[in-house]
């Protein structure tokens, strides 16, 4: 499998590096980094002061060169009635997106002894692996340690692991 990371806006090299590392580690796939793209026209909702996540998925699907493509942005994303999302993907689709905007809080609430930079890097890897998992047909998993577990807050992101549980692994083999 080939995954193309599509940076949207000015994305730090560390984010691209961590995203690539997480995907390679979990899915044993080829990963490329696409040229940076501007924020999609029409994605901004001035009433919410946020961006529509669907627009970023469409961008990744359109410009990405991979079998699976993931847009990564630092803009604040929402989807439908949700206040915000860390990421979004269509089940078995070609494109997905994650936002680092709400992953950048400095602490994991004492869950670990890691630095803020390491905590952020872990969150990026987990969310990229999670969203690409959806494009591979994986739904949310009930196992709280599985990367495919639904994580509405950074606390849940911090608690889960970067890897797929055995059940989810078997589904994509």
Swiss-Prot record:
Keywords: Hydrolase, Metal-binding, Metalloprotease, Protease, Zinc. Zn(2+) 1 binds at residues 130, 134, 140. Zn(2+) 2 binds at residues 141, 146, 165, 168. It is an enzyme of class 3 (hydrolase). GO terms for molecular function: metallopeptidase activity; zinc ion binding. The active site is at residue 131. GO terms for biological process: proteolysis. Its EC number is 3.4.-.-. Pfam families: Peptidase_M54. Its cofactor is Zn(2+). Binds 2 Zn(2+) ions per subunit. One is catalytic, whereas the other seems to have a structural role. Monomer. Belongs to the peptidase M54 family. Probable zinc metalloprotease whose natural substrate is unknown. This is Archaemetzincin.
């Amino acid at each position: 499998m080939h995954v193309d990371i599509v940076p949207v806006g000015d994305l730090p090299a560390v984010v691209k590096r961590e995203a690539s590392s997480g995907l390679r580690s979990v899915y044993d796939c080829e990963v490329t980094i696409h040229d940076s793209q501007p924020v999609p026209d029409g994605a901004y909702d001035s009433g919410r002061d946020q961006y529509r996540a669907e627009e970023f998925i469409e961008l990744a699907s359109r410009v990405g060169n991979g079998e699976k493509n993931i847009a990564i942005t630092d803009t604040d994303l929402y989807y439908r009635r949700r206040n915000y999302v860390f990421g979004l993907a269509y089940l078995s689709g070609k494109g997905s997106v994650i936002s680092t905007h709400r992953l950048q809080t400095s602490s994991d609430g004492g869950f670990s002894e890691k630095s803020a930079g390491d905590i952020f890097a872990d969150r990026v890897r987990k969310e990229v692996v999670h969203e690409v998992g959806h494009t591979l047909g994986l739904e949310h998993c009930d196992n709280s340690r599985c990367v495919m577990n639904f994580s509405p807050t950074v606390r849940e992101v911090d608690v889960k692991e970067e890897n797929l549980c055995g059940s989810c692994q078997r589904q994509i083999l």
